[in-house]
Amino acid sequence: MYYWFAMPRRVLAYTKTLTADIDITKIGFYGNSWGGQIAYNMNIDPDIKCCVAQYGNGWIHYWKTNSVWLYNIPYSEPPFSDGNNLYISTLECQAYAKYARNPMLWMMSTNDFHGQFDRGFRNFEITPVQGSYAFKANASHDITGFEQDVRLWFDKYLKGSAITWPSNPNTIPSIVAIGTAKATVSPSQPSDVTAVQFYYALVTADSLARTWFTATTTNNGDGTWSAQFPYSDGTRYVFAYAQITYSNTIIVCSKQAAFIPNNL
């Protein structure tokens, strides 16, 4: 992993010498898969003006190496060796999220075999810069239909296009009745929203194996949208989020809600 971090830095150093060919004040970084992991490291460099991390988002030692799924019941972690902890704190990309300098876009599939869907949100909780994310349901290493976000992100932050980027709202869960849950979102710029689609999933801690179902969405007319959906076990996790499409074709998703109905 060290070499993967080192190589793009060498490329960046060379790129900054090409002053006759490019505007070196407008350099962005796009990383796909393992390149997504690298994007977090590159985003601590002041010469990078914005980043896109596609799929990769760290936490490899947790979910991929040790099958430590965030929503296991009960949750437990194995003892990490000193070597594990050194790797986690220096080469796992979540270690760099809190030092980010530039806007970061995370493009993801909910069931991705490389990126970790559930833990990826943590990177955006600790980052000091603007971030955004969107993900395709029931897919792995596929963002078909979402690609325009990448172009528009670079248009906004490199070209300076007058694009207002919507925020990622929280997904607020509630219980309608025993066996029926509801999720509600409050999108930014609600007058520009053209579509909202809710997804929900039940029980499965392994995000790669999770099945996402669509739920009928209701526009509440007050700037919020909601959906109701069934669950069968109030002691197990329920997951929900909304995919929000805007008139300028930007798609963002709400932050995933993961909740145990009996605890609400």
What are these regions (language model features)?
Residues 38-81, 134-137, 142-148:
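Hydrolase active-site cap/lid region
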Residues 21-33:
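Alpha/beta-hydrolase fold nucleophile elbow
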Residues 63-125:
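The feature captures the conserved acid-bearing segment of alpha/beta-hydrolase catalytic domains
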Residues 29-31, 54, 107:
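Short beta-strand immediately N-terminal to the catalytic nucleophile in serine-hydrolase-like folds
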Residues 152-200, 206, 213-232:
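Surface beta-strand/loop "capping" patches
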Residues 1-20:
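Alpha/beta-hydrolase active-site loop
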Residues 249-264:
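Short beta-strand elements
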Residues 235-248:
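Short, aromatic- and glycine-rich surface loops/edge beta-strands on solvent-exposed regions
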